[in-house]
């Protein structure tokens, strides 16, 4: 009977000792690693992305599009319109009558 009692208290103490040693060793290396990777990643990604996209896109698209469309359209519409042809036949018809 006495031999069983001695074995029981001896087996539990070594178990908690091993767990305590492993726990404090795992968290310390993870803590300093997490903030280091997040800090340099966030500011580097948005900085070069924002100024490169809007700068060359906005000024290049509207500049060549606006002046090229209205210029050739305005002079072509009034030119072919037969403004002197309308009064010419009108005068001839009145003279014939």
UniProtKB/Swiss-Prot annotation:
Name the UniProt record assigns to this protein: Cornifin
Tissue spec. comment: Not detected in normal lung tissue but seen in tumor tissues. Cells around the keratin pearls contain high levels.
GO biological process: keratinization
Origin species: Sus scrofa
Highest taxon of the lineage: Eukaryota
Family membership noted in the UniProt record: Belongs to the cornifin (SPRR) family.
Modified residue annotations for N-acetylserine: 2
Region (7 X 8 AA approximate tandem repeats): 31-85
Keyword tags: Acetylation, Cytoplasm, Keratinization, Repeat
Region (Disordered): 1-42
Function: Cross-linked envelope protein of keratinocytes. It is a keratinocyte protein that first appears in the cell cytosol, but ultimately becomes cross-linked to membrane proteins by transglutaminase. All that results in the formation of an insoluble envelope beneath the plasma membrane.
Region (2 X 12 AA approximate repeats), start-end ranges: 3-29
